[in-house]
């Protein structure tokens, strides 16, 4: 049986190159005959034409409606587990608002950390990485007592807790000394810290500081959960610090991510932040059972990242930075915007949509995007 030349069939149809390659791959996969292949390509071309936008299409308005309408069906609940029973994250409408506002500090920062092959297959090795990441405080591995009479703090190490974390008494002693900038003595009761300033206030201040001293891990990572997914162990964290976690031994930073979009922007740049906005918004909508075409979200992400910096959708970002005075005033803070523009003597050239609707002029969208030219003279 002679091989069908699919290229000769496809060359008559003006598909984008990537679409042509995809169709060709599918035709080769199923080994269709020439007549069958032609019918399939014709069907694909009809679908392609049906999906093309009309000139002058209001892409922004359609995107706003397509995200906004499903948004009305989203729940207001803030906490729920995201596939991990022990970790709560913000979902639903509050999370979508967080994404579009590009909050620097999301209410429930969380990371998904994937490991290098030698650590991902073995639970004990995954636990080692988790210990290096999770914040371990002095109070987690020792009992802390205060001797008011002698102005001394006694730290009684818990041998089992230290062993679980892969620490020794020497490690604990060294960290306490660094934190309080003082000598630590080993006594029968435990590790003794003598307070230099003999006052109750100084003693209690040192006690509070010692309790919250991190002796291992990152202080931003409150908790780490290990889960087996398919054939590898994955770490989920409560808290986020992408920059430091990328340097932790055993972490596969090419597959590690956080739900803090601003942190992604600072560490990996604007293109990574754009992808994070798209992924997070899609995941939030899908978790609620809502289906939105990814291209609407891509348009929003493009607008938020177009200047090479993250801008929120709102009066402190995209909406507030419009050149038109009337467009800014129509969004929020009407009086303030009009007053400021009047004081500065600004002019509005009425180039956008909002301002033209306000003054009752045709807008540059759809049929209003073309200008008719009257041909004078000629045949009557």
Swiss-Prot record:
Alphabetized GO MF terms: DNA binding; DNA-directed RNA polymerase activity
Transmembrane segments: none
Enzyme nomenclature, EC number: 2.7.7.6
Record-linked CDD domains: RNAP_A
Record Gene3D superfamilies: 1.10.150.390
Known catalytic reactions: RNA(n) + a ribonucleoside 5'-triphosphate = RNA(n+1) + diphosphate
Cell compartments where the protein resides: Cytoplasm
GO-annotated cellular components: cytoplasm; DNA-directed RNA polymerase complex
Main location: cytoplasm
Top-level division of the source organism's lineage: Archaea
Entry keyword set: Cytoplasm, DNA-binding, DNA-directed RNA polymerase, Nucleotidyltransferase, Transcription, Transferase
GO BP annotations listed: DNA-templated transcription
Functional note: DNA-dependent RNA polymerase (RNAP) catalyzes the transcription of DNA into RNA using the four ribonucleoside triphosphates as substrates. Forms part of the jaw domain.
Family the entry assigns: Belongs to the RNA polymerase beta' chain family.
Quaternary state and interactors: Part of the RNA polymerase complex.
Entry protein name: DNA-directed RNA polymerase subunit Rpo1C
């Amino acid at each position: 049986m002679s091989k069908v030349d699919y290229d000769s069939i496809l060359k008559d149809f003006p598909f984008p190159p990537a679409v042509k390659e995809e169709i060709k791959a599918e035709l080769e996969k199923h080994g269709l005959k020439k007549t069958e292949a032609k019918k399939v390509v014709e069907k694909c071309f009809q679908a392609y034409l049906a999906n093309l936008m009309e000139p002058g299409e209001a892409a922004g308005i359609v995107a706003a409606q397509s995200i906004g309408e499903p948004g009305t069906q989203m729940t207001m609940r803030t906490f729920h587990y995201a596939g991990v029973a022990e970790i709560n994250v913000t979902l639903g409408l509050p999370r979508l608002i967080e994404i579009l506002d590009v909050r620097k500090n999301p209410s429930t920062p969380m990371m998904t950390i994937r490991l290098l092959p030698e650590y991902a297959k073995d639970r004990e090795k995954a636990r080692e990485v988790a210990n290096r990441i999770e914040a371990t405080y002095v109070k987690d591995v020792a009992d802390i007592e205060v001797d008011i009479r002698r102005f001394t703090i006694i730290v009684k190490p818990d041998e089992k807790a230290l062993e679980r974390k892969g620490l020794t008494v020497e490690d604990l002693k060294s960290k306490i000394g660094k934190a309080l900038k003082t000598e630590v003595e080993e006594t029968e009761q435990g590790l003794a810290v003598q307070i230099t300033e003999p006052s109750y206030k100084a003693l209690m201040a040192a006690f509070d500081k010692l309790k919250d001293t991190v002796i291992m891990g990152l202080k931003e990572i409150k908790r780490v959960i290990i889960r087996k997914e398919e054939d590898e162990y994955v770490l989920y964290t409560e808290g986020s610090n992408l920059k430091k976690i990328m340097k932790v031994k055993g972490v596969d930073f090419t597959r590690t991510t956080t739900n803090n979009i601003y942190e992604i922007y600072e560490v990996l740049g604007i293109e990574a932040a754009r992808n994070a906005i798209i992924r997070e918004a899609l995941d939030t909508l899908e978790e609620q059972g809502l289906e939105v075409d990814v291209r609407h979200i891509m348009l929003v992400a493009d607008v938020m990242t177009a200047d090479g910096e993250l801008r929120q959708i709102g009066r402190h970002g995209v909406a507030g930075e419009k050149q038109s005075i009337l467009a800014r005033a129509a969004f929020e803070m009407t009086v303030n915007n009009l007053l400021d523009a009047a004081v500065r003597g600004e002019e509005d050239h009425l180039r956008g949509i909002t301002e033209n609707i306000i003054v009752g002029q045709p807008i540059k969208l759809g049929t209003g995007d073309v200008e008719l030219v009257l041909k004078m003279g000629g045949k009557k």
